Structure formats: structure tokens, C-alpha cells
């Protein structure tokens, strides 16, 4: 598992996460550093992104707060509403925020520009 940073460029707030061993996470690692722009939905930060390579067998239903996904044209940092996330199918989870970083989510602005890179 590779450790990464997710830096919000306007505030300098940096989140730390670990990528998992999925095909999609390995594809993301090959693209680093990369930048994603998006906004806060109230339960996740959603940024447009090319999906890239992934194994459909590795997709899942639901997320855990702190998960990071890349799929369906989106890069997302999922931070809330885990209990209601069963409505979200075909989630391609590529990593998870470290606990200290999950608590920093509330400090981020509504519109974000994330630069993702190796820690």
C-alpha cells in the first residue's frame, strides 16, 4: 500500500491516505502527481477524473467514511453518510484517509483543487 498526500491547493491543507492494491489504485499511482478540481456535496468531495484501468470484480457497494474512490468519471473523497451509502453501487475504492486526515475534512472549502502525490 502506497502512502499518498491529497493537498488542497488554495488552503495548503494536506490529507494523508494509503492506496490499496486494486488495479485502479495501481493505475492512479502511475499517474501521480495529478490534480483534480471539484466541490463538496456535503458527504463527499467529488472531482471530475478519467476512470482509467480497473477490474470490475473489485468494485463494491457502499463506502466507509474516509474512503477514496476513482471511477465512473469521478475522483472522490468520501467522508460522510456511510450508513446510507448502500444506494451507491459499483464503487471503485482505491484508498482510505488516515484518521487524523479525516478529521481535517471540515476545514476544507466548498470548492477544491486537490493535488495528489506520493507522500
Task: Set out the residue ranges of the language-model regions.
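A short beta-strand micro-motif
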Residues: 2-9
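Short, mixed charged/polar active-site loops
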Residues: 12-14
